[in-house]
Amino acid sequence: MNRGLSKLHPYPFERMERLKASTRPPSTKGPIDLGIGEPQEAPPEIITRTLQEQLHQVTRYAATRGTEALRAAIARWLSRRYTLPAEAIDPDYHVLPVAGTREALFAVAQTVIGRGRPCVAMPNPFYQIYEGAALLSGAQPVYLPVHPATGLPDLAEIDEATWQRVQLLYINSPANPTGAAADLAYYRRLLALSDRHGFIIAADECYAEIYHDEAKPPPGLLAACHAEGRSDFHRCLVFHSLSKRSSVPGLRSGFVAGDPGLIHAFLRYRTYQGCALPLHVQQASTAAWSDEDHVIEARARYRERFNQVCARLADVLEEVAPPAATFYLWPRTPIDDQTFAQRLWEEENVTVLPGSFLSRAQGDGHDPGHGRVRIALVPELATCLEAAERIRRFVQRHF
C-alpha cells in the first residue's frame, strides 16, 4: 500500500458535506451553491457542434501525444495569448494535450520526482491536487503562505537548505482562491530561484482567461521565459485547461507546454499511465482553442457579476473587491470561517467554502486560509445577486 495514502486529507467538498450534515437549511429558500468552481455557462456552440459532428470517431483509438491539428491550435493560441513569436512554440516538441489539468498536475510529480529526501513546494492555500501529488510521489510538501499584500506565495518563507531539497514547485497564477495574478517581476524571481536550486516550475494557469480588465491579460510563465531570453523554457511547464476558459469542465481537455525534454519525459510517462483524449474531444478542443469570441463574452458576464455582487457586499464583509482574475471572491469573515459557512447554509441555504479547507497551518501555527471563505461567482447573474442579498442579510443580522 502506498504510504502516502494515509497522509491525504479529506477533499474540501467532502469536508463541506460533513460540515452540513448536522443541520438543515430552510425549505423556503432554494439552494445556491457558490462553493465549487464549476462554470455554469452554457457550453459554446462551436464545441457542442463539433462534438456532435465528430462523434463517429469514438470507434478509433487516439494517440497520447494528440493530433497534429490540436497541437498546432494550442501553439497558435499560446503565441497569440502571450505575444510570443510564431516560432517560439513548436507543436511537435513543446506541447502535449492532456485529459484536463487535474490529472496532469498530479502526474507531473510522479514523472519528475526522484529519490532522496525530495520536497515539493506549493502555495498555501492551494489546489489540493498539489499536496496529493507530492505525498503520493514520496515527497514532503512545503507550504508557501500567500502574502496578504499580494495574494501570491511569499518566496522568502523557505530557507536555502529547504530550497535545495525542492525538486518541483507548483505556482498557481491567476491564483485560486485569492484571485491574484503574478507579474513578470515575480516570475523572474521564480526563474532565478529555479536556476539557483535546480527545481522544476509547474505553473497552473487554468484561470488565465478569466480576468477582470480586458486590456490587461495576466502574463504567464512562458512569456516570462521569452522576456528573459529563455527560448528553451528550461525546467518550466505550464498547464492550461478548457474547463474554465470555455466553460466545459466535463470535457476534460487541457494541455501542458514548455521544456521539450520534460514534455518528452511526460509523454513517455503518460503513454503508460495517462488517458489519451478521445478523437471527438480533440476535434472540439481544436475548435475551442481557435476561437476567442466565446471567451470574451464569458469574461464580460463574469465582470458584471463581480461588479454587482461586490457593490452589495463590500460594506458588510472585509476585502470584497473584483479580483485581478479567476471567478472567486476571498473575503474575511467576522467569525471562524467554518462556523460562518455552516451558519450561512443553515439560515440562508447558500454554500460557500471555508478557507481553512483549502490551506494548512504553517510551522508557526498560522493558517492563511483561516477566517476567510471562497465564493465562486459561477451561477447566472440573477442567482449571484440573490446569493449576495442572502449573505448581506445574514451578516447584518448577526454582526
Language-model segment annotations:
Residues 59-192, 209-210, 214-230:
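Conserved core of the PLP fold type I
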Residues 84, 231, 343-351, 358-399:
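PLP-dependent enzyme catalytic core of the Aspartate aminotransferase-like
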